[in-house]
């Protein structure tokens, strides 16, 4: 019987969201166990009844050592390692976990006690995480990430609504977020002229486009908003506010990003644009549609396109608009206009 279970979460936001079904399955399989989740985005899975303890596992090595000590004090008897790194396997050994479950990826297999062979061909990331959860006794009967949004009457949701109202949203119109960035690299980014065209097309059908992204994307978002009917919240959608902001949207358009996975898990419909990566491996599951433009070089998995970016440049704004409208047809009616305070 497992009494203390430590789960090393992936390092990226989207991968962490895709790990939710596996974590949920392990929690259900071992209700008596103390469950600890460790990873850079562990707090994303907080408040969901999935864990007793969350440990933010930072990227900096100095911070990781301190976090490893926190996990070690829990004295886990079992560790499930979702990343395929040597570091995660060594960390589990340092934690003192007698049972260490992970994929056989290179030399790390020598540190694991339960080695799971990577599937060939590779499967969707969600399904691969579920393979590890099954080794831990979990069921793989639910493979769709689900997160409960922040409370509608909470402070974070109120702040999100205020930001959207400032951006001209929720005036009885559909609000469509358009996320510009991708931590993976510029090869995942839809061209700015396509984004501007989408904003114009959405405006013609009575929808308000709101541009999202980090502070690094703020200049590009401002340039788009200057020539198209859209407002920019880029740089203002900080991580702590992001779940509330996404929950307030009627739909989201995004590249293959963690934000797309988070929005879908929260119940917001998503149109995900895929170029250099493979939707068969990482498309959002739920109320989402993945769009691609077939070209011979895709998926290349390059972070920077060495040619003219044909995969995403070939995705026409009208096609994206039509996909958004199809999702909105099955969505609840738009929210009423906000009262002026």
Describe each model-derived feature in a short phrase:
Residues 1-341:
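Catalytic machinery of carbohydrate-active enzymes
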């Amino acid at each position: 019987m497992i009494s203390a279970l430590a789960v090393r979460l992936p390092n990226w936001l989207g991968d962490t969201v895709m790990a939710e079904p596996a974590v949920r399955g392990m929690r259900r399989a071992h209700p008596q166990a103390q469950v600890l989740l460790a990873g850079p985005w562990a707090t994303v899975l907080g408040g969901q009844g999935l864990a007793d303890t969350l440990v933010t596992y930072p990227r900096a090595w100095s911070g990781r050592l301190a976090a490893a000590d926190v996990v070690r004090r829990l004295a886990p008897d079992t560790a499930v390692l979702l990343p395929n790194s040597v570091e995660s396997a060594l960390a589990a050994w340092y934690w003192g976990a007698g049972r260490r479950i992970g994929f056989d990826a290179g030399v790390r297999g020598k540190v694991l006690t339960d080695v799971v062979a990577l599937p060939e061909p590779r499967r969707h990331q969600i399904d691969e995480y579920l393979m590890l959860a099954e080794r831990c006794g979990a069921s793989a009967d639910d493979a769709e990430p689900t997160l409960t949004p922040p409370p509608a009457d909470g402070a974070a949701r109120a702040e999100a609504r205020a930001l959207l109202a400032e951006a001209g949203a929720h005036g009885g119109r559909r609000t469509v977020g358009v996320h510009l960035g991708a931590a993976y690299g510029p090869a995942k980014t839809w061209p700015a002229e396509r984004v501007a065209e989408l904003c114009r097309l959405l405006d013609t059908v009575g929808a308000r486009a709101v541009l999202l992204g980090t502070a690094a994307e703020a200049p590009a978002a401002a340039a788009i908003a200057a020539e198209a009917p859209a407002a920019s919240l880029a740089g203002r959608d900080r991580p702590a506010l992001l779940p509330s902001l996404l929950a307030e949207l009627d739909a989201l358009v995004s590249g293959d990003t963690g934000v797309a996975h988070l929005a879908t898990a929260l119940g917001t419909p998503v149109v995900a644009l895929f170029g250099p990566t493979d939707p068969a491996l990482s498309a959002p599951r739920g109320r989402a549609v993945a769009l691609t433009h077939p070209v011979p070089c895709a998926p290349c998995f390059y972070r920077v396109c060495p040619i003219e970016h044909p995969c995403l440049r070939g995705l026409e704004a009208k096609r994206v608009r039509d996909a958004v409208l199809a999702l909105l047809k099955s969505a609840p009616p738009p929210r009423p206009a906000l009262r002026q305070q």
